[in-house]
């Protein structure tokens, strides 16, 4: 079973929501389980797209209330871990697609790269080492179709555990 994470802000622009919805739809069409933080914004839009295409959505919730998941999450996992639940999302996913996002998304990207997970940035953070090179495992996509293709291809990036 392939599981891909979709990460991004709990609040997002209409454009980011549309990108996330399209990512979710395309993941579902590939038979992929979508894992996310289960909240609003990018997470909700991605789950909506996945459900519209008949997919499975898994929300790793920060709190202990299953009912806090957005209405498009079909499998809600309350953790009571707060933002620390981000590491559960990262470790559950085989790769992650970041759409937009703020500091929480940036922390997920860093954790994913640290654990050797491929991260696809779709109008999200673009990171560079001090020498100007991108970190291994971070790839920029131009559109949802490319983001999903990149997330599904190849082996996970080499990490530094």
Predicted regions and their residues:
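Short, hydrophobic beta-strand segments that form beta-sheet elements in well-ordered domains
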Residues: 56-61, 119-123
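Short, ordered loop/turn segments at secondary-structure junctions
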Residues: 39-40, 62-65, 124-127
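Glycine-rich oxoanion-binding loops at beta->alpha junctions
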Residues: 60-96
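General beta-strand structural signal in soluble alpha/beta enzymes
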Residues: 35-37, 59-60, 99, 140
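C-terminal binding/interaction regions
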Residues: 7-11, 23, 82-155
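Glycine-rich beta-alpha loop segments
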Residues: 1-58
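C-terminal amphipathic helix plus adjacent low-complexity
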Residues: 157-161
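Short, hinge-like loop/turn segments at secondary-structure boundaries
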Residues: 51-55, 74-78, 116, 137-140
């Amino acid at each position: 079973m392939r599981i891909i994470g979709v990460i991004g802000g709990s609040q997002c622009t209409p454009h980011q929501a549309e990108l996330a919805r399209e990512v979710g739809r395309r993941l579902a069409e590939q038979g992929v389980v979508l894992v996310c933080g289960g909240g609003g914004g990018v997470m909700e839009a991605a789950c909506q797209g996945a459900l519209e295409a008949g997919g499975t959505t898994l929300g790793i919730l920060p709190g202990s209330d299953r009912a806090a998941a957005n209405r498009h999450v079909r499998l809600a996992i309350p953790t009571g871990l707060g933002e620390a639940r981000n590491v559960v999302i990262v470790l559950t996913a085989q790769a992650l697609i970041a759409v937009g996002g703020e500091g929480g998304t940036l922390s997920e990207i860093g954790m994913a790269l640290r654990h050797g997970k491929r991260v696809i940035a779709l109008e999200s953070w673009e990171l560079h080492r001090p020498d100007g090179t991108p970190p291994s495992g971070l790839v920029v996509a131009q559109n949802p179709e490319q983001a999903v293709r990149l997330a599904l291809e190849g082996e996970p990036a080499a990490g530094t555990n």
